[in-house]
UniProtKB/Swiss-Prot annotation:
<feature type="topological domain" description="Extracellular">
    <location>
        <begin position="280"/>
        <end position="284"/>
    </location>
</feature>
<feature type="topological domain" description="Extracellular">
    <location>
        <begin position="351"/>
        <end position="384"/>
    </location>
</feature>
<dbReference type="Pfam" id="PF02949">
    <property type="entry name" value="7tm_6"/>
</dbReference>
<feature type="transmembrane region" description="Helical; Name=2">
    <location>
        <begin position="67"/>
        <end position="87"/>
    </location>
</feature>
<comment type="similarity">
    <text>Belongs to the insect chemoreceptor superfamily. Heteromeric odorant receptor channel (TC 1.A.69) family. Or1a subfamily.</text>
</comment>
<comment type="subunit">
    <text>Interacts with Orco. Complexes exist early in the endomembrane system in olfactory sensory neurons (OSNs), coupling these complexes to the conserved ciliary trafficking pathway.</text>
</comment>
<keyword id="KW-1133">Transmembrane helix</keyword>
<dbReference type="GO" id="GO:0005886">
    <property type="term" value="C:plasma membrane"/>
</dbReference>
<keyword id="KW-0716">Sensory transduction</keyword>
<feature type="transmembrane region" description="Helical; Name=3">
    <location>
        <begin position="129"/>
        <end position="149"/>
    </location>
</feature>
<feature type="topological domain" description="Cytoplasmic">
    <location>
        <begin position="199"/>
        <end position="258"/>
    </location>
</feature>
<feature type="topological domain" description="Extracellular">
    <location>
        <begin position="150"/>
        <end position="177"/>
    </location>
</feature>
<dbReference type="GO" id="GO:0007165">
    <property type="term" value="P:signal transduction"/>
</dbReference>
<feature type="topological domain" description="Cytoplasmic">
    <location>
        <begin position="306"/>
        <end position="329"/>
    </location>
</feature>
<dbReference type="GO" id="GO:0034703">
    <property type="term" value="C:cation channel complex"/>
</dbReference>
<keyword id="KW-1003">Cell membrane</keyword>
<feature type="topological domain" description="Cytoplasmic">
    <location>
        <begin position="88"/>
        <end position="128"/>
    </location>
</feature>
Length: 384
């Protein structure tokens, strides 16, 4: 079935967290210890990073690195915490999407629409996940590599770690270093996994909502039946589907609204990453900062692009009404004509996805991109 591909990548990612998206409620938390370990690994690592920043207040590069790391940790904890807090609500919303898709994908056109949006969603989600995986792997592998290079040059083995942190023990001992390094890796996994899970879930639900709006638009343009009764039934179904799409969009916005506020943090993060990229332009750490910058840009782009697409698809329903075969209804049923007018007025409002202070749309993405470009131009001057 077409719905078998629903949330395929997202379900696999959430299983790594010990959570099930598409099963019954009683098996929702199949392995709760995974989520707990994920939270503890990040929460326990943050004090080490904060201590590193306090210890290097006079060093701008190291202080910036620690602030950036703390910001990422806080965002990851907020995401996994919010998802677990609203877990039942998210599962109910996912179940609603699944039921509507099952009901509405019995025609060839509907299948084509859902398949196209699903492929786009899985491609974007996979690319986003690969960026985080590349950033995490490069960070974890670069520190041992830097240690080996430094040892070949100086003959001394200095412990280095993927992320800024200080420890209450001597890492010159191999056993202590292994424990510290493993702690870094666990923290990296604890940050990347929930971040990718929640962001790709929003991406998938947004694309499926766009598909449902497109199906409603297609049915609106072909609502005419073989007789008056069938025509009325078709219109009734179209309006019900459109109302259901609006309802799904409302709940999607309500549940993800606190996360969309991350644009403020992401914008600050991009400014910090500009400095770090320029400071490490000829260093092995460049791969990590480049991949991580791509991941943060992808994160902002996902929310802005998906939010803009939902809003546009909702508004296009009014155009579908205008292009449909409605003139003959003027002579048959004036009440239906009034319903069409009301639907057109409602569609003009769209279905905005906002984060309290701003909307997640292309204009916001352009604003963030311009700020990123301006900071990129000024960064070389600061370094000089």
């Amino acid at each position: 079935m077409l719905t078998d591909k629903f949330l395929r990548l997202q379900s696999a990612l959430f299983r790594l967290l010990g959570l099930e998206l598409l099963h019954e409620q009683d098996v929702g938390h199949r392995y709760p210890w995974r989520s707990i370990c994920c939270i503890l690994s990040v929460a326990s690592f943050m004090p080490l990073t904060i201590a590193f920043g306090l210890q290097n207040v006079q060093n701008v590069e190291q202080l910036t690195d620690s602030l950036c790391s703390v910001l990422v940790d806080l965002l990851a904890l907020c995401k996994i915490g919010l998802f677990l807090w609203l877990y039942k609500d998210f599962k109910f919303l996912i179940g609603q999407f699944y039921c509507v898709l099952q009901t509405e994908t019995h025609t060839a056109v509907a299948e084509m629409i859902v398949t196209r949006e699903s492929r786009r969603d899985q491609f974007i989600s996979a690319m986003y996940a690969y960026c985080f995986i590349t950033a995490g792997l490069s960070a974890c592998l670069m520190s041992p590599l830097s240690m080996l290079i430094s040892y070949q040059r100086t003959g001394e083995l200095q412990p280095k770690f993927p992320f800024p942190s200080v420890y209450p023990w001597d890492n010159m001992k191999l056993s202590n270093y292994i424990i510290s390094y493993f702690w870094n890796v666990c923290a990296a996994l604890g940050v990347a996994l929930p971040t990718v899970c929640v962001d790709t879930l929003f991406c998938s639900l947004s694309h499926n909502l766009c598909a449902l709006f497109q199906i409603a638009r297609h049915k609106m343009m072909h609502f005419e039946g073989r007789n008056t009764k069938e025509t009325h039934e078709n219109l009734k179904h179209v309006f019900q589907l459109y109302a259901l799409c609006l309802n799904l969009g409302h709940f999607l916005n309500e549940y993800f609204r606190p996360l969309i506020c991350q644009f403020v943090a992401a914008s600050l993060h991009l400014c910090v990453l500009c400095y770090q990229l320029s400071a490490n332009i000829l260093q092995p750490a460049l791969l990590f900062y480049a991949a991580f910058t791509a991941a943060v840009v992808g994160q902002v782009s996902i929310y802005c692009f998906c939010g803009s697409s939902i809003h546009s698809e909702c508004q296009l329903f009014g155009q579908a009404i205008y292009e449909s075969s409605w003139p003959h209804l003027l002579q048959e049923n004036l009440q239906l004509v009034s319903s069409l007018k009301i639907a057109m007025m409602r569609s003009s409002l769209g279905c905005p996805i906002d984060g309290y202070f701003f909307e997640a749309n292309r204009e916001t993405l352009i604003t963030v991109s311009k700020a990123f470009i301006k900071v990129s131009k000024k960064t070389p001057q600061v370094n000089d």
